[in-house]
């Protein structure tokens, strides 16, 4: 399997072949705030205060010193963080190639345009419904939320790279096909369908045309895994290679990945110049198959990446 064909642009064969604790840092994800104006039923709040902007700048600069290629700002809802534009501009100034934002899609068009002007070129937005009644419920009962989100997805898709995440729960799983078709009508770049962590590990049968599924690499990858009986989560490799050149940060701490952090896992260590070495030691000593968080939540695409990294190392 060529990782580049899956659709997650930060996960490639070249990266798996070359990843070490001293290679270019390929990706960083920074939690800016736990605040959110939605109350999605499946969301696991990260808690804690907004990150101090000077601490956020410190993290970005430390990552940039390691040649950071891709950064993602998330939360909570990162558009509620007052210093977001300043951090985006700093990332661009330091040479970061791709700047991504995980957002619920509720901000104003003016704010999203200002973020594009500052340097954001990747938007990840949740789309868990295909109609206003269901969409407002999935946002925690916020009336009118779905219409705002849908229109923002539509116009952002015309000017930027936009993926939508369809989180399936018992409330919306029966409308998976309608949601996919609606997302397609908005002009998105890709569609990430995934069951909520609380709802189990399998996807429902996706009864849309092969032509539509194959239009979206990530959707096609997930649908093929479902047809072959593969779960979205679980079954990790013994060693995690993603930690070598990838980092999730919240406050003063760095974590193996964003999922590990959201599931309540312990940080690898404190933010500082020795982070890459700490992550190397974690990679060498941590058995992911014996870690309940990894064993139950590692995404299949991460398993494929780690498997590819192992195969390259065995050849060497």
Question: Which functions belong to the PLM regions below?
Answer:
Residues 35, 39, 44, 67, ...:
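Conserved functional loop/turn residues at catalytic and ligand-binding sites
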Residues 48-102, 106-121:
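Conserved Radical SAM active-site core
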Residues 1-49, 61-64, 214-217, 233-234, ...:
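N-terminal pre-core extensions flanking Radical SAM catalytic domains
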Residues 31, 72, 163:
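Conserved beta-strand segments that form the floor/walls of ligand-binding pockets within enzyme
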Residues 51, 117-122, 126-272, 276, ...:
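Radical SAM enzyme [4Fe-4S]-AdoMet core and its adjacent flexible, acidic
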Residues 28, 60, 88, 112, ...:
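Generic structural signal for well-ordered alpha-helices
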Residues 43, 71, 99, 123, ...:
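Hydrophobic residues within beta-strands of alpha/beta enzymes
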């Amino acid at each position: 399997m060529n990782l580049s064909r899956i659709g997650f642009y930060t996960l490639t064969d070249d990266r798996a072949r070359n990843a070490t604790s001293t290679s270019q840092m390929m990706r960083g994800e920074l939690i800016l705030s736990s605040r959110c104006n939605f109350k999605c039923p499946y969301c696991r709040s990260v808690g804690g205060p907004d990150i101090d902007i000077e601490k956020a700048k410190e993290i970005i600069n430390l990552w940039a010193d390691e040649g950071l290629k891709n950064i993602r700002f998330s939360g909570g809802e990162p558009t509620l963080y007052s210093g977001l534009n300043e951090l985006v501009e700093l990332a661009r100034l330091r040479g970061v190639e791709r700047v991504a934002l995980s957002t619920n899609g509720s901000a104003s068009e003016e704010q999203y345009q200002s973020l594009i002007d500052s340097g954001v070129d990747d938007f990840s937005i949740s789309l868990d419904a295909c109609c206003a009644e269901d969409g407002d419920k999935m946002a925690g009962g916020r009336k009118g939320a779905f219409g705002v989100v849908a229109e923002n997805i539509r116009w952002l898709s015309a000017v930027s790279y936009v993926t939508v995440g369809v989180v399936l729960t018992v409330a919306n799983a029966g409308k998976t096909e309608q949601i996919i078709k609606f997302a397609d009508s908005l002009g998105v770049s890709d569609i990430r369908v995934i069951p909520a962590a609380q709802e189990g590990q399998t996807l429902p049968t996706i009864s849309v045309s092969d032509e539509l599924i194959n239009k979206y690499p990530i959707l096609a990858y997930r649908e093929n895994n479902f047809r072959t009986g593969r779960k979205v989560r679980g079954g990790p490799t013994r060693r995690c290679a993603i930690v070598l050149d990838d980092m999730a940060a919240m406050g003063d701490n760095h974590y193996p990945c964003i999922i590990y952090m959201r599931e309540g896992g312990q940080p690898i260590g404190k933010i500082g110049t020795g982070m890459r070495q700490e992550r190397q030691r974690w990679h060498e000593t941590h058995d992911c198959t014996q870690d309940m968080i990894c064993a139950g939540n590692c995404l299949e695409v991460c398993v494929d990446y780690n498997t590819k990294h192992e195969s390259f190392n065995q050849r060497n």
